[in-house]
């Protein structure tokens, strides 16, 4: 027994000696690499540190020094890669987290910088300034921005602020910059570009009216009414096939940016051609007259979760033979609910995955009979900026699905390109001769959109983005259930005030038709 204890003691002593020798060897190798770097012999330092890192793979110090050498060699991607490797070995390392956060900040990737800074209790803010100062009620602005001087800017606070500003919906562009102040503190500068017309007064009104003239429509908009973030939108369309008169008013409830209201009224007089309900040769013509009103509210429940609820009522009259329940005239009363939630983000790789889900319940009081309305829809959207800095390249993909029962045909899901439709298969027409009904229509649908954009022109107050797309989808429960696909290119002109003009040149792969379509909208 004594001999066993003696052998164990000798083994422990030998292990301790080997560990001490390894530490001494690692210190010497590290000192050699640092000395070469201080002499500006960066290539030699890189080779020496890399060889030593292979000898001591569990020592994060070599990776940290390699990151510094890569930075001096202007290899920023290599520096960030080495820092991430080092922080996997030593997650709480102050120097590594500070270094990596600073590199992300230089790239303009504030979320990634905060994801590293917050691990070590940084960055501490000296003050928050606005440049320029937003024309917004001071109480609204103070409550919308959830961080201030003397606080640590966390991802949680940043996300809560971004949600509040989204709900206010008065800024076309936002940018938050951090600059060192001293003593380890930072000054946060918020640059909030308001949604504005290129012209003011009479010329601004005329410009707003002229935007819709190519589409036989005029649109009036007023944003940030009385500096309280109330936004009003009015639309009049005199197209003989789809007349429309609509008004929408939205804004925060009281002076709380995390709660908002929305009131809308919508009147339509439309003529529809509905081919392929029973066979490809059948075309059913219908005239729809509908008036609708909706009142709703939006609530930010957490920094990432938004819930909206509304009550909607509408009355419709459908001229033509009532071939089934979908063509019955009458009243509808519904309650609609929706939640929006970012479900997955990789700030350092600039990837974001978001989702939303909606539920609608109600009653259709038709002339023939009354029936229950029940339906829902959901969406998952992925967005990736592949470059470490800037957004000249952007890849997007989205999946949508939904179903509803008990509603008239005009409440079905419509997948063709039409300005009144929320879901598009780009390249597939949604109207023929100006009449709705040409695209896939049904009580249930599946839609997948994909594409990428590249900035091809950037000048003051104007940006042009273009890129290819491929969309595919299927609607069932009304028209013949078939998969429709479209491919082509989309060009977007983004003006500084938040106005976007889009041109789509696509091909319907099922019908073999070329489709050209354009639209004007807001992009914030």
Regions inferred by a protein language model and the residue ranges of each:
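Gram-negative/organellar outer-membrane beta-barrel architecture
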Residues: 157, 161-352, 418-433, 438-441, ...
């Amino acid at each position: 027994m004594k001999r066993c204890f003696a052998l164990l003691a000798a083994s422990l002593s030998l292990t301790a000696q080997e560990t001490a020798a390894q530490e001494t060897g690692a210190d010497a190798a590290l000192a050699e690499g640092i000395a070469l770097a201080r002499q500006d012999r960066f290539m030699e330092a890189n080779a020496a540190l890399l060889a030593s890192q292979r000898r001591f793979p569990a020592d994060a110090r070599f990776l940290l020094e390699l990151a510094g050498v890569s930075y001096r060699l202007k290899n920023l991607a290599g520096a960030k890669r080495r820092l991430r490797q080092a922080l996997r070995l030593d997650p709480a390392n102050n120097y590594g987290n500070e270094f990596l956060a600073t590199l992300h900040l230089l790239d303009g990737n504030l979320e990634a910088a905060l994801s590293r800074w917050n691990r070590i209790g940084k960055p501490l803010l000296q003050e928050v300034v606005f440049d320029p100062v937003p024309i917004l009620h001071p109480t609204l602005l103070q409550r919308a921005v959830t961080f201030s001087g003397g606080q640590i800017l966390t991802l949680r606070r940043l996300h809560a602020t971004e949600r509040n500003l989204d709900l206010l919906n008065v800024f076309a562009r936002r940018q938050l910059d951090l600059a060192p102040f001293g003593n380890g503190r930072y000054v946060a500068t918020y640059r909030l570009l308001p949604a504005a017309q290129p012209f003011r007064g009479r010329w601004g009104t005329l410009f707003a009216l002229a935007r819709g003239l190519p589409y036989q429509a005029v649109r009036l908009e007023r944003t940030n009414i009385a500096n309280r973030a109330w936004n009003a939108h009015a639309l009049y369309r005199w197209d003989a096939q789809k007349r429309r008169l609509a008004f929408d008013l939205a804004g925060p409830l009281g002076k709380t940016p995390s709660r908002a209201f929305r009131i809308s009224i919508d009147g339509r007089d439309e003529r529809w051609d509905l081919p392929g309900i029973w066979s490809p040769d059948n075309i059913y013509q219908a005239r729809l007259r509908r008036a609708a009103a909706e009142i709703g509210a939006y609530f930010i429940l957490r920094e990432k979760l938004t819930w909206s609820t509304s009550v909607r009522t509408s009355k419709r009259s459908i001229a033509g033979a009532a071939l089934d329940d979908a063509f019955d005239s009458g009243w509808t009363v519904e309650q609609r609910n929706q939640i929006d939630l970012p479900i997955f983000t990789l700030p350092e790789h600039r990837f974001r995955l978001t989702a939303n889900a909606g539920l609608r319940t109600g009653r259709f009081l038709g002339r023939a009979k009354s029936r229950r309305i029940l339906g829902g829809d959901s969406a998952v959207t992925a967005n990736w900026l592949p470059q470490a800095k800037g957004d000249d390249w952007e890849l997007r993909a989205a999946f949508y699905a939904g179903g509803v029962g008990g509603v008239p045909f005009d409440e079905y899901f419509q997948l063709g390109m039409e300005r009144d439709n929320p879901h598009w298969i780009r390249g597939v027409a949604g109207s023929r001769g100006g009449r709705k009904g040409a695209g896939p229509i049904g009580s249930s649908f599946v839609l997948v959109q994909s594409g990428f954009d590249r900035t091809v022109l950037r000048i003051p107050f104007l940006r042009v983005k273009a890129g290819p797309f491929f969309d595919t989808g299927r609607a069932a429960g009304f028209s013949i259930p078939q998969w429709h696909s479209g491919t082509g290119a989309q060009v977007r002109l983004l003006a500084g005030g938040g106005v976007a003009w889009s041109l789509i040149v696509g091909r319907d792969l099922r019908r073999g038709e070329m489709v050209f379509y354009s639209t004007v909208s807001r992009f914030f």
